Amino acid sequence: MARAIMLQGTGSDVGKTVLVAGLCRAAKKRGLKVRPFKPQNMSNNAAVADIPGDNNHGGGEIGRAQWLQAIACGVAPSVHMNPVLLKPQSDVGAQVIVQGKVFGEARARDYQALKGRLMDAVLDSWAKVGEGADLVIVEGAGSPAEINLRSRDIANMGFATRADVPVVLVGDIDRGGVIASVAGTHLILPEEDRRMIVGYLINKFRGDVSLFDDGLKAIEKFTGWRCFGVVPWLKAAARLPSEDSVVLERLASGEARALKVAVPVLGRIANFDDLDPLKAEPQVEVVFVPPGKPLPSDAGLVVIPGSKSTIGDLIRFRENGWDRDLATHRKRGGHVVGICGGFQMLGRRVRDPDGIEGSVTEAEGLGLLDIETMMEPEKTVRNVSARSVQFDLPLEGYEIHLGRTTGPDTMRPSAIINGVADGAISADGKVIGTYMHGLFGADAFRGKFLESLGIKGGGIDYRVEVERALDDVAAELEGHLDCDALFGLAR
């Protein structure tokens, strides 16, 4: 079995995902066969990964974070890297994905009772990920200090103690109170869990690190733990795909550029990293529009992203007045792209007679495409190779969706996937819908698409940019963490 080390946080969004990705890349550069692992993730930003030994299945779902971490390791993503994925459908319920496949749906209280049964799947995947690896770097979820959930925990100390994996605690100094967060975690953890922690690190530091020397001494006094380093705010991390929708709350529009792309932040937004390749283009400004704010009138393109609750988000789309903004945008000659759930919303109607996504079984669409969607229980999950109909260029991406879409505008498909038409295009060519995620990740297509909107010189090599960002993050960590000591404590 491979040696392992685990990063757990003093809270959510402390930067564990980027740290694990950077450490994975640093270990890879040392010549180690390294793999990522996250026992349980909660995200509607999913990726399609291989299901080892299942040659007849199109693929399974994992969190995009583990997909990125696998890329950092230089290996193909596997469903075993994230055996339990929770995809929120409401404030109190989520779809449960186990080893890539839909296990069922559970309300928050029911899921707590279910977690004990899921530990077997977690440990099975854990054993598989370690096969042939030298090192596995594990990412926790939330915080081990949530001691009210400890008895059935599979994400943090529940896993670490069962798998005997040493833990490094991550504190986020940017949000304030990091001394209390680290010392408080030490205080309330039971002795069995406290023994698993071999040290800590401070993340997202800004300014002169020497000003925190007394803080480090205070943490050592209260905990006795070793500090592996103080990591600065990593600018390179902004060039990596984002997984957590928390980041959308903090994204400002930035400097004005040649093309403004408006993205309404849906309540159950999914796979919003579809926009990352556009964000990386020097002439493109991507603006995420929060609920209650109008779609900007100077946007040349509106992208409606995926959704885990299409009908619910369609209803809220109208409540925000975005349907009126979108109609005005179209009257001005603006372009619209709908991806997956966003594609379904662009039609005349969405029907869900079996209540697969919720209690509301039907909703009027935005009417920009002459199509209708019927939700069906079987989910499509697969990586795809396709060809753009508009530009006759190759595309690479993936599908994760429920529902079947029909109607006159599907006679003008946006892509051909394995010989089958996908999506729809309006008669004037300015409204495009597709089920294919990753559309903008195809450099040649993205360049031609931007050219059709009047933007010349687009189509940067996005994959190369991601690889460079991973290298830069790893280099920053090497400069501020004792990576040799950290890897040396893995067991």
Swiss-Prot record:
Q: Which GO terms describe its biological process?
A: cobalamin biosynthetic process
One Pfam short name: GATase_3
What does UniProt list as catalytic?
Answer: C340 (nucleophile), H437
One Gene Ontology molecular-function label: ABC-type vitamin B12 transporter activity
Q: Which UniProt keywords apply?
A: Cobalamin biosynthesis, Glutamine amidotransferase
Identify the CDD domains for this entry.
CobQ_N, GATase1_CobQ
InterPro entries from the entry?
A: Class_I_gatase-like (IPR029062), CobQ/CobB/MinD/ParA_Nub-bd_dom (IPR002586), CobQ_GATase1 (IPR033949), CobQ_N (IPR047045), CobQ_synth (IPR004459), GATase_3 (IPR011698), P-loop_NTPase (IPR027417)
Looking at the record, the residues that make up the GATase cobBQ-type domain are 258-445
Q: What does this protein do?
A: Catalyzes amidations at positions B, D, E, and G on adenosylcobyrinic A,C-diamide. NH(2) groups are provided by glutamine, and one molecule of ATP is hydrogenolyzed for each amidation.
Which protein family is it in?
A: Belongs to the CobB/CobQ family. CobQ subfamily.
Protein name as annotated: Cobyric acid synthase
Q: Which organism is it from?
A: Mesorhizobium japonicum (strain LMG 29417 / CECT 9101 / MAFF 303099) (Mesorhizobium loti (strain MAFF 303099))
Gene that produces this protein? cobQ
